[in-house]
Amino acid sequence: MKKRIQKTILTVLFSSLSSIAFADMQSIAELQRRLEHVAQYSADFEQTVRSSKGQQIQSGRGKFQVKRPNLFRMDINAPQENVIVSDGENLWFYDPFVAQVTVNSVQNAVNGTPFVLLTSSDKQHWTQYEVTQNADTFVLKPKSAKNNLRQFDVQIDQNGLLKGFSTIERDGQTNLYRLRNITTADLSADLFKFSVPKDVEVDDQRRVKK
């Protein structure tokens, strides 16, 4: 009798886990389908940063540009200038205020920079997250406890139009990005190339062994 009960419990548990995994795969496939529907776009964004208690602590604005596959650029104009560029292989973060560039490989950066997923079809990238869907909102949660993020939400309609995205960090701080003035005009590949400015320090994280 005891063995029968244990077998029943294991069967139910396995069935539940299989259902969750299948739903996760469905959500990933649907999100990828929507993201791939629009090959390139440019948009202005407004950023709102809130503390874990919900208090607004910062706001910002800038431009977000994507060209699939694997290319994106984010120009942050306020509260201070920053530039983030993915050239498909490397992820560049330029902070003019401190005259420093940090560069990492896209493969290594996907954990801490989920924006990479908005342009990637690499299965290795997607397997690092659990994905659930609620209408036009997709919730991505990193599987690794070492990830600095707790959650990454993507708002995208069935036609592939990205409306916004948000992150929740481990400490509860949230970053909300709302997109507007979205266009799908052709974007030059030169936008996604980064040249290190003169007299700027380079922190090359590609050399750091994981």
UniProtKB/Swiss-Prot annotation:
Pfam families: LolA (PF03548)
SUPFAM superfamilies according to UniProt: Prokaryotic lipoproteins and lipoprotein localization factors
Cellular compartments annotated: Periplasm
Keywords for the protein's UniProt record, in alphabetical order: Chaperone, Periplasm, Protein transport, Signal, Transport
Family annotation (InterPro entries): LolA/LolB/LppX, OM_lipoprot_carrier_LolA-like, OM_lipoprot_carrier_LolA_Pbac
Signal peptide range: 1-23
GO BP, sorted A to Z: lipoprotein localization to outer membrane; lipoprotein transport
Cellular component annotations (GO), alphabetically ordered: outer membrane-bounded periplasmic space
Main subcellular localisation: periplasm
Similarity annotation: Belongs to the LolA family.
NCBIfam families found in the cross-reference section: lolA
Its job: Participates in the translocation of lipoproteins from the inner membrane to the outer membrane. Only forms a complex with a lipoprotein if the residue after the N-terminal Cys is not an aspartate (The Asp acts as a targeting signal to indicate that the lipoprotein should stay in the inner membrane).
Quaternary structure, from the entry: Monomer.
The protein's name: Outer-membrane lipoprotein carrier protein
